[in-house]
Amino acid sequence: MSFDPNLLHNNGHNGYPNGTSAALRETGVIEKLLTSYGFIQCSERQARLFFHCSQYNGNLQDLKVGDDVEFEVSSDRRTGKPIAIKLVKIKPEIHPEERMNGQVVCAVPHNLESKSPAAPGQSPTGSVCYERNGEVFYLTYTSEDVEGNVQLETGDKINFVIDNNKHTGAVSARNIMLLKKKQARCQGVVCAMKEAFGFIERGDVVKEIFFHYSEFKGDLETLQPGDDVEFTIKDRNGKEVATDVRLLPQGTVIFEDISIEHFEGTVTKVIPKVPSKNQNDPLPGRIKVDFVIPKELPFGDKDTKSKVTLLEGDHVRFNISTDRRDKLERATNIEVLSNTFQFTNEAREMGVIAAMRDGFGFIKCVDRDARMFFHFSEILDGNQLHIADEVEFTVVPDMLSAQRNHAIRIKKLPKGTVSFHSHSDHRFLGTVEKEATFSNPKTTSPNKGKDKEAEDGIIAYDDCGVKLTIAFQAKDVEGSTSPQIGDKVEFSISDKQRPGQQIATCVRLLGRNSNSKRLLGYVATLKDNFGFIETANHDKEIFFHYSEFSGDVDSLELGDMVEYSLSKGKGNKVSAEKVNKAHSVNGITEEANPTIYSGKVIRPLRGVDPTQIEYQGMIEIVEEGDMKGEVYPFGIVGMANKGDCLQKGESVKFQLCVLGQNAQTMAYNITPLRRATVECVKDQFGFINYEVGDSKKLFFHVKEVQDGVELQAGDEVEFSVILNQRTGKCSACNVWRVCEGPKAVAAPRPDRLVNRLKNITLDDASAPRLMVLRQPRGPDNSMGFGAERKIRQAGVID
């Protein structure tokens, strides 16, 4: 469309108002604005007028759609249509502004390119809302209505002015100010938990964030490291912390993408077993991969499939993990290839699994005398090992103790691969010249130090008239009894894989040395299948198994004199063997001092208190005199009643006697002074008010009451205490009634029941009544009871 300004009916006017023109001027709003012309929407009437940009009095760059203008109306000379001339921009009126608080409902899209870039003034809009008098109102806004260089997001809290377009009547928001950004919810994984707080590994950046347990919205008992959570980040004291922590379904947060394809590479740097103080790299390991361009991938201690020790030069297979947050690549799911031992410089050894414990075990080595410790985590290929399995392994020093070795990288071998030695089928006879000892008896933990090195024993034997000697080890002895000096044994001779070495194996005891010394002792303790013997010096006890007793075990009683020999079993522990009953200790030949002393037990026998180290008990004289405070030992022989259980603190009377081969003065004929009252009597048993150990009542059976007396509650009694060796519980025996207790008097009816009976009103119609629905009858359908009811005395059975 062409336009000629000279065609306007302006009567020679220059087109610009000088303030003296009397022409009628109107107002309107720029509705459309193009490069050289535009259109105005009139405010006072429904009309849309064309105008040429040359008719605008001012900088055209400041004119935009929506601006208020003042103009005159003229007509196009050629077409006769009304047009606007002499345009002047009207300054906006200043109205009192009321600012409203609200929030963004729909944000203006960011980086949205206009489909018609040639059309200025057309920009995308968003919407906000506010509340007034319980109603919610929605307004539109554009990015130009936002103050400052701020990009609003949905949910942001804002403050704005309501603008009412007087020309179009449209209401919008302008002068928008951001009050508070919406708190974004982040996701992560709980990576550490302390006493009252923890840390979350964030899913958006490679960073950990602190959280306090009070911020967890849920059951804290169920929260554990590895759980997926979402949270809000807040700033407290200048530090970011996680708040409003909530659980997410497992698997929601994914940090990395793991390749499906497997790769192979070579370990160039291993993770140190003991990290240095300056070690800050969380992925210290390195694996070289032969891609088109060779590269090294890092890995950490959690990236291996198992805990098997990696060595430099190992050939491994792995996946590549790519972190979504920073795109860092690392090797993961690392497993050692079976052919890796061809490329490493390690010395491999062989052996057989000798023992298995909880999480660790021991290997009997082919080339070493000592058993080699190993941990289950060092087993390759996830195999489960059993005792006698043949294995191959590498020996390395322990990181915590250089003097101790252990086996790593254990590989299971086929049966028949390992051979310790070749031995002849011929059996030899010999005599033990030196006993063999173990190194560490009953080793259950690899952290226990060696108490004593193992020592080989020596066997003297005759081979074709030539007297020879050969070494043997305690582990090669068959049976539970170790041979002692002078014992006859049978054995085989084996050649170890290490050349030039012979050793006796499969050593079996044939007979004890007939000249072995026989000792006397006294039965001190009897358990289910073993017991202890008090030595002739009465200062210690010796273990013996019932299988070593010649005779009926049931005939053994505490205090019986026995004869025995000493033997060393596995673990260098001394025990009694070939136990024979001699004669009763009651016929003791030593003469006791006739003086009777009063004393107090200050230490019981070890059989009563197994926690104490010393076997002997101790009694202190408490009666006035020159000997008050003197202490004398005692054993099972010194007890008047061998089954009596003397406890610490009990009062006793005793005599003194010189006993034992070392002529020691000891307490003898010890009798406890116990007196207490009967707590209660049941049918066939009762309880005495006497404290024994943790129990404040002492049990007794009625058959233990002497002279057939029927005890009543409150009776004062004397008694002995015996210890059940099988159950470890004490009970009373030999119960004598010293004096009767007070007779039980029937207690009167309590006042509360008497008062209640007095207050019952039988005539009250509202009172609860008891109605008989069915009369009682006996089994034969008769009424009443055949036997007369009698008053029964408590504790007496008819």
UniProtKB/Swiss-Prot annotation:
Modified residues (N6-acetyllysine): 81
Location of Phosphothreonine modifications: 761
Domain SUZ-C: 748-789
Modified residues (Phosphoserine): 123, 276, 514, 584
Keywords: Acetylation, Cytoplasm, Isopeptide bond, Phosphoprotein, Repeat, RNA-binding, Ubl conjugation
Compartments in which it is found: Cytoplasm; Cytoplasm, Stress granule; Cytoplasm, P-body
Gene3D superfamilies in alphabetical order: Nucleic acid-binding proteins
UniProt entry tagged with the keyword rRNA processing: no
Annotated SMART domains: CSP
Segments forming a coiled coil: none
Pfam families: CSD, CSDE1, SUZ-C
Domain CSD per the UniProt entry, residue ranges: 26-87, 136-179, 186-245, 297-337, 349-410, 447-507, 519-579, 610-670, 674-735
Cross-link (Glycyl lysine isopeptide (Lys-Gly) (interchain with G-Cter in SUMO2)): 91
GO MF entry, a single one: RISC complex binding
Keyword RNA-binding (UniProt): yes
Any one Gene Ontology cellular component term annotated for this protein: P-body
Family: Belongs to the UNR family.
Function comment: RNA-binding protein involved in translationally coupled mRNA turnover. Implicated with other RNA-binding proteins in the cytoplasmic deadenylation/translational and decay interplay of the FOS mRNA mediated by the major coding-region determinant of instability (mCRD) domain. Required for efficient formation of stress granules.
Protein name per Swiss-Prot or TrEMBL: Cold shock domain-containing protein E1
Species classification: Eukaryota, Metazoa, Chordata, Craniata, Vertebrata
Gene name for this UniProt entry: Csde1
